[in-house]
Amino acid sequence: MKRLVSKIDKSVNFVNTTLGTECRYVRRNDKYISAYLSSHNGCKMACKFCWLTATNQTNFRHVSIEEYANQLDTVLSHGKEIDGENSRIVRVNINLMSRGEALANKNLVNNYDKFHKELQYIINKYDYSEMKMNVSTIMPKVVEHKKLIDIFGDRPVNIYYSLYSTNESFRKKWIPNSMRYEIALRKLREFQKETDNTIAFHFAVIEDENDNLSDVQSMAEIIRSMNFSKTKFNLVRFNPHPSMSNYKEPSVEKLEKIYEILQSVCNDETIKTNRSRIVPRIGQDVLASCGMFVDNDL
């Protein structure tokens, strides 16, 4: 196990060189820990913005429920060293946002109840106050035949949909293995009606690719038309792999304009915490920021 500690913000990237997974400890404030867990050892979803795609790390071994729990144990063992008895007032955000695609992990999809119980056990083991489950997904084609309620049941979960764009040419180029956005949005709306869960849209903005303001406005109107009861938008930062030097994030001014357009259709006034935002980068020096992963040879 390699332990990469950020000199920027004390984020820690735990790299299991035997299993090929990464789990991350991130602390944005004292109130909660963000534990980023891997769902696979690589990824074959072929998302163009992802470092796994750029470095051809396409092995797709499904992380077991035990491995998920072990990853969380690793992160919280580190967290407990810092928090001590104060852990009782600290929330743990479990973010399935590291390696792989959570909704393509057969162990999670077929036995979410057991998965949830095992991770809750680890939370209790370290005496943390509560667990919040956040699942990032491109809504892959492999679960197009499934209802989200059949996967998650009545267990609490927050879906973070990596929509990126409703422009089909962009989607074919950048997220080729995602289901059509129309299908994904219907599934998410149906899931929200059944659970009253917040639906979050989170994605990066890439200059000259998905930053056209007219396209963003169109995407916003499509989302508005779905009548989601509780939504939020997180614009995460684009961190292109060095081999993608011809792509970059637009200016901060452009990013803020895009955020304003999206926020105009957002119903997050009903959300008491963790509102829409432009998400700051974390742990870049240990490859812990969005879309970044260690190379095969580390």
Swiss-Prot record:
Binding site for [4Fe-4S] cluster: 43, 47, 50
Domain Radical SAM core, residue spans: 29-272
SS bond list: none
Cofactor(s), names only, from the UniProt record: [4Fe-4S] cluster
Cofactor remark from the record: Binds 1 [4Fe-4S] cluster. The cluster is coordinated with 3 cysteines and an exchangeable S-adenosyl-L-methionine.
Keyword Transcription: no
Listed GO MF terms: 4 iron, 4 sulfur cluster binding; catalytic activity; metal ion binding
GO biological process, one term: tRNA methylation
Keywords, in A-Z order: 4Fe-4S, Iron, Iron-sulfur, Metal-binding, S-adenosyl-L-methionine
InterPro entries the UniProt entry points to: Aldolase_TIM (IPR013785), Methyltransferase_A (IPR040072), rSAM (IPR007197)
Name assigned to this protein: Uncharacterized protein R756
Source organism (scientific name): Acanthamoeba polyphaga mimivirus (APMV)
